[in-house]
Amino acid sequence: MSTYSARFGKVVRELKSTAVVSVNERFGDTKAPPAQVTALWDTGAYSSAISEKVVDALGLKPIASVRACGVSGWYDSPVFKIDLQLPNKIKITGLPVSLGKMVAADILIGMDVLSMSDFNFTNKGETVLSIRTPSEGDAPFVADTQEAARSGGGQYPFV
């Protein structure tokens, strides 16, 4: 099992970390050195995407194309296969990624990657992002809340 936690020092609306992207040896020239990148963790993204900057830096060649949808709408996108090392040192090999139209990060980590791990974030005073790979099971928030209600707690106003 591998774990990772990042403390942001305040409540944030973007979950970012570093990651390492490299050429998948079956689909490209492995002479390009791995690239340390800024990763944006996006639970609303079905799949992961990389920036044109990373594609160019690694000399990635497309293996297919897809119709993708981002915040700016639908577009045709090439697909690349990469190797991705997460901050918890877990390496995902042969990950298909589309070309994303991104400004805030070099790679967008979507649910295709997040679903391989236990992933949560908390916001009590500061944002803390936690990842555990492989998945060990659920986080029993409902059971915890029901127990708090039985013991006299359990009021959670939206502020």
Give the ranges of each region predicted by the language model.
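Pepsin/retropepsin-fold aspartyl endopeptidases
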Residues: 1-159
